[in-house]
Swiss-Prot record:
One of its GO terms (biological process) is toxin catabolic process. The keyword Cytoplasm applies. One of its GO terms (cellular component) is cytoplasm. InterPro entries: Glutathione-S-Trfase_C-like, Glutathione-S-Trfase_C_sf, Glutathione_S-Trfase, Glutathione_S-Trfase_N, GST_C, GST_Phi_C, Thioredoxin-like_sf. GO terms for molecular function: glutathione transferase activity. Keywords: Cytoplasm, Detoxification, Transferase. It is found in: Cytoplasm, Cytosol. This is Glutathione S-transferase F5. Its EC number is 2.5.1.18. Glutathione binds at residues 47-48, 76-77, 89-90, 102-103. Its main location: cytoplasm. Residues 37-118 form the GST N-terminal domain.
Length: 256
């Protein structure tokens, strides 16, 4: 007899498989966990941080209940949402009684709980592979994201709020991004992806801002570098990422 372990942490799943014959109570417990309510995510489908978490959920083939926090309407500043996250930011991720904020922390949690399911996003087979991946995840957070978030805000998000793009800021930020992308180009000449020759969380973290920037003048900075262009084309074409960007699916609560 098998069990549906889509939401059961691996430790529980393996333990109960081993003890099932002698422990009906353990098996019943695992069945109850497997049938528990799906994950809930408070977010906004246009939010880069929300999309980062959605990409992980889709890479793992997990279902979720999307709860809209309309950032343009200011829902994140309302007392009802601040009671959920006092920082007033999305996403907020609920797994039963566990509440998590910060998209990268949420992403690593999901990928760790479901490490044997779907795409292997955390390549921690050895200390060396772990170190390399963690390094590139940090590079994304501290070198790539601050610049590309500024460019995304100025060119893509501001217009949603009816605000004008500050092209002086754009030009200054692009000058800094040039140096970062030169380093990426050298890395990607010798590696299919950033952390290894397979797609990992280090690549996934880059997707939200890249997706927006591909529709701006900044696109040229990515396509003018052959190795970066190849990498961008490959990661943005992933089915899980396309689903993460499907705004209609969010509002229609389309699930896996």
């Amino acid at each position: 007899m098998g069990i549906n372990a889509s939401h059961v942490p691996e430790t529980c799943y393996h333990h109960c498989n081993q003890t099932f014959e002698s422990s009906r109570q353990c098996f019943k417990w695992c069945q109850e966990l497997a049938r528990k309510d799906e994950y809930k995510i408070y977010g906004y489908p246009y939010s880069t941080n929300t999309r980062r978490v959605l990409a992980v959920l889709h890479e793992k083939g997990l279902s979720y209940d999307p709860i809209t926090v309309n950032l343009i309407a200011g829902d994140q500043k309302k007392p009802s949402f601040l009671a959920i996250n006092p920082f007033g930011q999305v996403p907020v991720f609920l797994d039963g009684g566990l509440k998590l904020t910060e998209s990268r922390a949420i992403s690593e949690y999901i990928a760790t709980v479901h490490k044997s399911r779907g795409t292997q996003l955390l390549n921690y087979k050895s200390y060396k592979t772990m170190g390399t991946q963690r390094m590139w995840m940090a590079i994304e957070s501290f070198e790539f994201d601050p610049l590309t978030s500024t460019l995304t805000w100025e060119q893509s998000i501001k217009p949603m709020y009816g605000l004008k793009t500050d092209y002086k800021v754009v030009n200054e930020t692009e000058a800094k991004l040039e140096k970062v992308l030169d380093i990426y180009e050298e890395r990607l000449k010798n590696s299919s992806f950033l952390a290894s020759n397979s797609f990992t969380m280090a690549d996934l973290y880059h997707l939200p801002n890249i997706q927006y920037l591909m529709d701006t003048h900044t696109k040229r900075m990515f396509v003018n570098r052959p190795s970066v262009r190849r990498w961008v084309a490959e990661i943005t074409a992933r089915p899980a990422w396309k689903r993460a960007c499907d705004v209609k699916a969010w509002y229609h609560k389309k699930k896996n």
